[in-house]
């Protein structure tokens, strides 16, 4: 029985996983050969990097010895050992053995289930990351196929290239870390919101079918993300509030249906947040306890203070080289203090740290490898933002967009930027958390995509239709008008 459980079953499951990854890449290549090549290249680089890093650390080879952290692990991913050990114990002894207060319990439980099928090797966690990477690429491409034909490939290339080429995401994909898993469900959340935000120009039957897909996607995504990073779905729920306001203000047809869909998603999201985990519920309690602007600042200062107290080699100090984190010795209760801390935080998010140090704006005492990786990732992130902005601007000149979804995407990006810039003072943590901010940019062009056909439903807008600025079609004969 043990032979079947821990040898034959993992071998069979691993073979099926490989077949699934190959088929997914073939499907993407069938949609666009260039996209297929890009995704396959990203997958190949991740496999090669994961194998190299694993064996270097496992065999204690004399390569980057100071960064190695045991058999198969690295110091730049300290929490990976904790996730791995909890998941192995859960796979062997049952999920009930995972402590209720465990960090990112939903991810640990998912990893334990995965290891019970594929084996308890460290590399099993990496294979899960590879599946999440390919799945995220496929999800982006599936939605963006609704763009006009001549815009689809170039737009999808921007999003998929940003996902595939992010140095930080590439690194965390090679470790037993939660980021790839989390980002898949974060993109799923945006896809679900896109489905819910689209029906205002469609017949009621098509709108209900979109809702039948969108609400479960939003609920599932919130349940999972609440158990990984509980603050993210809380922020997304607030962004959905802005989307709902936009829908009500703009819609002229079926506005009650659209408002009901958005309201249902918010209610379901709140319930899902409660079910997600105790950690997720803790963030929800904080959110609902806020009554005044003073409560907001008190909560944010408390979160920021936790990073300041934690310290660390990559905690940012001011240009004078103070030992504390940025703003630790300043009066951040004042408007000027908050503005100064915020401006330094924004600079740290979007400007390479080496340049900030050269200008004496910030100072860090250590973390050389993480700083180098962070600088490269910052440059790539900036390029991605500019490319997305240019593509969005060009699309809006020719394709009728979904303004409510754009409101959601922009408000989500702005809230994430403001909160991370003020709260997170540790550069190493900030660079990893910045991957959350990439999600609204990867998915921003969803606003211009349409579903050509719903399961079992009538054709809606053809994917190759191009709309003029007034909303009339210039290709095809549907002639849908903007409402």
Language-model region placement:
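Hydrophobic, aromatic-rich transmembrane alpha-helices
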Residues: 18-23, 137, 351-400
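Transmembrane-helix motifs of polytopic, lipid-linked glycan transferases
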Residues: 19-25, 127-149, 383-387
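Membrane-interface helix-loop-helix junctions at transmembrane boundaries of multi-pass membrane enzymes
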Residues: 27, 146, 154, 201-213, ...
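Membrane-interfacial entry segments at the cytosolic side of transmembrane helices
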Residues: 31-37, 205-215, 248-264
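Extracytoplasmic catalytic/substrate-binding loops of multi-pass membrane glycan-assembly enzymes
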Residues: 56-86, 95-110, 120, 352, ...
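Loop-to-helix entry region of an early transmembrane alpha helix in multi-pass inner-membrane enzymes
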Residues: 101-112, 117-135
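Transmembrane-helix signature of polytopic, membrane-embedded enzymes
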Residues: 123, 140-165
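Membrane-interface alpha helices of multi-pass inner-membrane proteins
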Residues: 170-171, 204-230, 236, 241-244, ...
């Amino acid at each position: 029985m043990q032979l079947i459980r821990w040898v034959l079953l993992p071998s069979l499951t691993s073979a099926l996983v490989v077949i699934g990854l190959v088929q997914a890449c073939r499907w993407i290549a069938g949609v666009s050969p260039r996209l297929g090549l890009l995704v396959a290249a990203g997958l190949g680089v991740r496999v090669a990097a994961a194998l190299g890093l694993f064996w270097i650390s496992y065999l204690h080879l004399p390569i980057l010895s100071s960064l190695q952290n045991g058999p198969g692990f690295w110091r730049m991913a300290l929490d990976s050992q904790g996730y791995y050990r909890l998941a192995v114990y859960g796979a062997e002894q049952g999920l009930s053995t995972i402590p209720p207060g465990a960090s990112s319990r939903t991810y640990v439980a998912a990893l334990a289930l995965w290891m019970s099928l594929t084996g308890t090797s460290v590399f099993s966690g990496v294979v899960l990351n590879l599946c999440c990477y390919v799945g995220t690429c496929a999800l982006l491409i599936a939605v963006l196929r609704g763009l006009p034909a001549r815009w689809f490939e170039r737009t999808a290339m921007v999003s998929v290239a940003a996902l595939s080429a992010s140095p930080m995401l590439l690194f965390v994909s090679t470790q037993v870390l939660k980021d790839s898993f989390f980002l898949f469900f974060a993109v799923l959340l945006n896809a679900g919101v896109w489905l819910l935000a689209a029906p205002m120009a469609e017949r009621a039957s098509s709108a209900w079918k979109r809702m039948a897909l969108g609400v479960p996607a939003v609920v599932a995504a919130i349940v999972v993300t609440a158990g990984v990073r509980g603050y993210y779905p809380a922020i997304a729920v607030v962004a959905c509030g802005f989307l709902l306001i936009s829908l009500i203000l703009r819609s002229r047809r079926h506005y009650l249906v659209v408002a009901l869909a958005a309201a249902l998603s918010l209610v379901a999201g709140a319930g899902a947040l409660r079910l997600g985990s105790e950690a997720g519920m803790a963030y929800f309690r904080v959110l609902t306890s806020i009554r005044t602007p003073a409560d907001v600042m008190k909560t944010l200062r408390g979160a920021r203070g936790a990073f300041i107290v934690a310290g660390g080699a990559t905690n940012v100090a001011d240009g004078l080289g103070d030992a504390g984190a940025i703003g630790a010795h300043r009066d951040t209760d004042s408007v000027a203090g908050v503005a100064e801390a915020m401006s330094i935080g924004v600079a740290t998010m979007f400007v390479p740290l080496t340049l900030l140090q050269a200008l004496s704006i910030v100072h860090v005492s250590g973390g050389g490898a993480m700083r180098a990786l962070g600088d490269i990732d910052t440059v790539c992130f900036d390029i991605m933002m500019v490319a997305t902005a240019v593509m969005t601007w060009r699309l809006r000149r020719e394709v009728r967009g979904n303004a409510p979804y754009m409101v959601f995407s922009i408000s989500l990006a702005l809230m994430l930027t403001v909160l991370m810039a003020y709260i997170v003072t540790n550069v190493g943590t900030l660079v990893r958390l910045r991957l959350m901010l990439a999600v609204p940019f990867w998915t921003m062009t969803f606003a211009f995509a349409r579903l050509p056909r719903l399961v079992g439903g009538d054709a809606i807008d053809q994917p190759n239709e191009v709309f003029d600025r007034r909303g009339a079609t210039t290709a095809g004969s549907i002639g849908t008008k903007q409402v």
